[in-house]
Structure formats: structure tokens, C-alpha cells
Amino acid sequence: MSKEKFARTKPHCNVGTIGHVDHGKTSLTAAITKVLAEAGGATFQAYDQIDKAPEERARGITISTAHVEYETEARHYAHVDCPGHADYVKNMITGAAQMDGAILVVSAADGPMPQTREHILLARQVGVPALVVFLNKCDMVDDEELLELVELEVRELLTSYDFPGDDIPIIKGSALAALEDSDQKLGHDAILELMKAVDDYIPQPERPKDKPFLMPIEDVFSISGRGTVVTGRVERGIVKVGEEIEIIGIRDTQKTTCTGVEMFRKLLDQGEAGDNIGALLRGTKRDDVERGQVLAKPGSITPHTKFKCEAYILTKEEGGRHTPFFSNYRPQFYFRTTDVTGTIELPEGTEMVMPGDNIGMTVQLIAPIAMDEGLRFAIREGGRTVGAGVVASIVQ
């Protein structure tokens, strides 16, 4: 079977199912493909096809993730579903599967459970912009008042983690009813209602190209008679020849002008998100720039040394540490293209961190790095990855 060409006629959006174990995330994923397949917007994938998620590696960490794609009238979606709780934690922290929005699945029979909380907190910390709730297994609850109580509880929980609990769409239904065609209203209709809510409520993500220009510097060359060239892959935005840009991180911020953009030995008028380019910098000396700095649109990003983050610490089996660590632990933090040493401060009441834990902590770096919330990094010891993290908020 030859792969169909991916028609980019509709806007694209990345979503995922999150929620407590056995609340029906994978069943819902299967149900969405089933219902949308009837309208020709998907290929039906049964529960066990999705449940056998292949392993992937992201930032040196093995994660099992299932990828499903489907489309509604409005958009094309890539949907991620993870088999185990640990996979969700790793996925959200490493950003292996980017989520522009998430569907929080809560069993109406159980209400919010510990992992429901944890996934909402993680979504908040890693910057998932919007959530939609599917109240699953409603066919198991006869009492309308009980359903309303569960809905209220979910809304209060969302509000307590700074999501707009009163405004978030909550759709009541049953993934199983949709898969077994046993109840039109709770099954088929609820899935369509859910997808309409996902279409309407999860904002269309800004394309990387439309964001302010940023390029991590990978290498620096001096070309006689022309000046200094820095190379790297443009992470976001566009840089045009003749534009003023800033060099940020490690040292004091410098201003310069991009006087040339080269790709595959050809001169271009501009470089854009995804391009591997060489940028010629006016009046910049070879020794003024280094790997680990970034080129960026002036004023769009600032250098910082202290931040709060959410991190996952690898287990011994994953190639991580064999022993716990304590406050004042000093590993390297690998941002984009370089390692910077930093000191970890654990939250009050946390004595130590064990391999396999995920933890919120504060980090103080010895040199400033261009950062904003949502920036991913690896935690390393002597070049070996021992953890992964994401910047939740900047302290200074």
C-alpha cells in the first residue's frame, strides 16, 4: 500500500488524550477514529492497535507513544496516546509529542483521581494551551445528579490549576458505546460533539514561521574578506538579509546585522523556520560568538540564569542515575546546543529525588541562557543524560 500524499489543505493541530489510568483514554482515541471514519476523515484503529504503542527515543529517554491521525471538517489532527502513566509524564516534559491542546478523559463512575490531577498540573507546567474534557463511561451512571457532581468536581479541579474551569467544554459520553454502537446519543453523537468542541475551543497554533526569529548557534566560522558566519537550524520565524538581530546568551547581549543568508552554498534573501543556514554577521569577530548562544529578533527573548522547572529523572534501567540526589546537586543543563552547569534547589519538604521521579524544582545557572517558558532541556552528568525538563517560569 503506497502512502497517500499528505494534503495540507486544512490547518494542522496536535492533540493528545490525558487522564487517569483505565478512565478510557485509548478507548476514546479508538472511538474518535471510528466515528470520523464514517465521514471519511480517518481510518478506524481498534483499541489493541493503539495500545501496542511503539517505543521512541526523545532526548535520550525511551517513551511509548501511539500516533493516530484524523480530520474533521475544520482541521487535520495528529493525536498522541500513551499506554502508561510514566510515558505521559516523560512525553509532556520532553515535548516529544507536542500538544497544542489536550482531551482530558475522566471516568464519570470514578470522578477525578490522582493521575487526573497530575496530568492537569503537568499540562499547566509544560504550557498546554487548552483542555477539553470528555466525561467517559456515562452509561455506567444512572443518576443525573451524580454526573453533575462529577462535572462540578472536574471544573473546580481545573480552576485550582489555573485553567478556566467554568469555560472549558465538558462532553458527557461513552467511548465504549461509540465502539459498540450501543447508544447513539452517548456514543456516536457525543464523539461528534467532542470533536466540535476540540475544533472550536482549542486555538489554532501559530505556525513556527510566524513567530519571532530565533536560531540556536551550532558553529562559528571566519571567512576571510567576508567576516563571521554562524550556522544552525532556524527554530522559528524568518530572518531577512539586512535585518538587525541580537546575539543572546552566555555573555552580554550584542546587536548585529545579518548581511547574508546561505543554504546549500546558495545565497538567499531570507532563512525561515526549519532551514539549516549560515548567517553572515556584520562587524562581529570570530571570538565574539560561540555555540550555545542564539540569534534572535531584537527584544523577542532575554537571557536568564534562574528558573523554575518541571523535570523527569531517569531510572537506572533507562541509563540514568543509580542513586537519589539532594538539594545543591550540580549537573549540566543542556539547552538547544550546549551544556551549562546549574545548581538545583528542591521544593520545601522534599528531602531527595529518586531515579524515576518527576519533580518541580528551581535551578540557578552559572551563565545566562536565552529562554522563555516552555523551553525544553536535558539534565546531564558528564555527557550522559540523567533527566529531562521544561522551563515552567522564569525567576530572574
UniProtKB/Swiss-Prot annotation:
G4 as annotated region, ranges: 136-139
Keyword Metal-binding annotated: yes
Region listing for G1, in residue ranges: 19-26
Keywords from the named record: Cytoplasm, Elongation factor, GTP-binding, Hydrolase, Magnesium, Metal-binding, Nucleotide-binding, Protein biosynthesis
One Pfam family in the UniProt entry: GTP_EFTU
Positions with a binding annotation for Mg(2+): T26
Entry-linked InterPro entries: EF-Tu_GTP-bd, EF-Tu_GTPase, EFTu-like_2, EFTU_2, G_TR_CS, P-loop_NTPase, Small_GTP-bd, T_Tr_GTP-bd_dom
Chief place of localization: cytoplasm
Catalytic activity: GTP + H2O = GDP + phosphate + H(+)
Record region (G3): 81-84
Cell compartment(s), UniProt: Cytoplasm
One Gene Ontology CC term in the entry: cytosol
EC number, UniProt record: 3.6.5.3
Broadest EC class assigned to this enzyme: hydrolase
GO MF: GTP binding; GTPase activity; guanosine tetraphosphate binding; translation elongation factor activity
Binding site for GTP: 19-26, 81-85, 136-139
Domain of life according to the entry: Bacteria
Subunit structure, interactors included: Monomer.
Family affiliation: Belongs to the TRAFAC class translation factor GTPase superfamily. Classic translation factor GTPase family. EF-Tu/EF-1A subfamily.
Record protein name field: Elongation factor Tu 2
Organism: Rhodospirillum rubrum (strain ATCC 11170 / ATH 1.1.1 / DSM 467 / LMG 4362 / NCIMB 8255 / S1)
